[in-house]
């Protein structure tokens, strides 16, 4: 088991991708990419493939799906020389322990079975997630979200909470929607959606894309290289993901009060480009709230009695605590994706009332950053408390370039650089604005990171 733990520690550095071929020659497609771990089904558990992968610095992780005989599969995986096993779905603790006796294990259950308290040592992940992009109605029009702008399907709020609650490396292992052939931009969105939240998306291609890539078709290879350029962008700046979330607004939540739902309160606030720090209820402390001025306490009844003094001290210092009406419960969603259409009128009205309280308190205050002319985009602000370096990620979920974006930050900064995939860095000129300092960005195709100091 000690050896397994040593191997497992190394898996925290895995840049993962699902791989559908067991042909050693297919590994050539991973050359000059950041991918260093491949997830393969049992059909590719051949010693020849594993040996070839090891020769080019790629670890092979075997996938065991729900319903499989995991104990027997673990023995075959060990005999083939696999580095670890990935178990997807629901397995008993007894079965997982038996598999762990053979090889290190990465568990990817549904969200309801995430073990946040046990995640720090080896990482945590799930296969259950929204496919990132603008939500489109049946008629082809963009769906409006609770905030009034285009509804962005995202896992960002969920991933940010999991990072805050567990302190672990997080894998988002959702697959593309079945039966759809997707443009490469949708894969870029999936990679960016996880990366800006501090996680990693397990790269997964639809059958058409995978077929074109393995056949070395020009378009398939070009799309693959473009996707890999974006994955590399986030890996080259991995230190940014370890910066603490910045901003003066905190959201106090736990798994029982909607924190595991995509499209939940963190995502609703994020759609306004208002930076928000997730704080898990069990981690509530003055240290976690340092530097904030506003706290949204989504379910006051869930705060342990011993921690309520922290909230009282926070308010006594002149800070604002926003709480919903007594008895409010965040609507439960079986698939962990908020959908206004599936809410009862009562739940809809209650959620709308809470949202109005939040927006009325926040107003147009600059709680860390304001982003203008960016519909269909999401942002995330990171940086050390007390000023210094700040990094603002910007992700475009639309099918067109975003142009003429303006960013205002409350702190004064002397330098501003815009980092783009492919290694391009643009120097921007800061200027004084009413709320602090601002910069203008001419155009963003898919992803950018604004670094200021």
What are these regions (language model features)?
Residues 2, 7-301, 305-319, 324-332, ...:
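Glycan-processing catalytic domains of CAZymes
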Residues 201, 342-368:
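Catalytic cores of secreted or luminal carbohydrate-active enzymes
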């Amino acid at each position: 088991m000690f050896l397994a733990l040593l191997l497992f520690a190394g898996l925290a550095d895995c840049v993962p991708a699902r791989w559908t071929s067991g042909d050693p020659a297919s590994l050539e497609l991973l050359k000059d990419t950041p991918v260093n771990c491949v997830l393969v089904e049992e059909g590719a558990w051949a010693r020849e493939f594993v040996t070839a992968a090891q020769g080019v610095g790629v670890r092979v992780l075997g996938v065991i799906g729900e319903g499989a005989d995991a104990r027997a599969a673990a023995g075959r995986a060990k005999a083939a020389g696999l580095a670890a096993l990935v178990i997807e779905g629901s397995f008993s603790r007894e079965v997982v322990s038996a598999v762990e006796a053979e090889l290190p294990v990465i568990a990817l259950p549904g969200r309801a079975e995430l073990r946040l308290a046990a995640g720090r040592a080896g990482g945590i992940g799930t296969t259950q997630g929204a496919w990132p992009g603008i939500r489109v109605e049946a008629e082809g029009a963009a769906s409006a979200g609770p905030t009034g702008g285009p509804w962005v399907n995202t896992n960002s709020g969920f991933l940010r909470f999991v990072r805050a609650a567990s302190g672990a490396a997080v894998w988002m292992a959702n697959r593309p929607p079945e039966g759809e052939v997707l443009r490469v931009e949708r894969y870029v969105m999936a990679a960016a959606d996880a990366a800006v939240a501090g996680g990693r998306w397990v790269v997964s291609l639809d059958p058409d894309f995978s077929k074109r890539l393995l056949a070395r078709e020009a378009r398939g290879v070009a799309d693959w290289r473009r996707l890999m350029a974006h994955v590399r962008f986030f890996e080259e700046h991995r230190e940014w993901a370890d910066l603490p979330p910045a901003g003066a607004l905190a959201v106090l939540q736990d798994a029982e009060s909607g924190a595991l739902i995509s499209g939940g309160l963190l995502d609703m606030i994020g759609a306004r480009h208002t930076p928000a720090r997730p704080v898990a209820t069990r981690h509530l402390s003055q240290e976690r709230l340092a530097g904030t001025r506003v706290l949204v306490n989504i379910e006051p009844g869930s705060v342990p009695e011993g921690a309520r003094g922290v909230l009282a001290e926070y308010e006594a210092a002149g800070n604002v605590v926003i709480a919903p009406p007594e008895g409010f419960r965040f609507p439960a969603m079986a698939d962990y994706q908020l959908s206004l259409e599936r809410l009862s009128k009562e739940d809809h009205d209650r959620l709308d009332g809470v949202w109005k309280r939040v927006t009325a308190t926040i107003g147009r205050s600059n709680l860390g950053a304001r982003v203008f002319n960016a519909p269909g985009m999401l942002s995330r602000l990171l940086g050390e408390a007390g000023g210094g370096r700040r990094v603002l990620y910007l992700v475009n979920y639309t099918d067109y370039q975003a142009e003429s974006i303006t960013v205002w930050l409350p702190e004064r900064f002397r330098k501003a650089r815009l980092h783009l995939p492919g290694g391009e860095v643009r120097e921007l000129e800061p200027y004084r604005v009413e709320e602090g300092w601002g910069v203008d960005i001419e155009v963003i195709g898919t992803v950018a990171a604004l670094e200021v100091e």
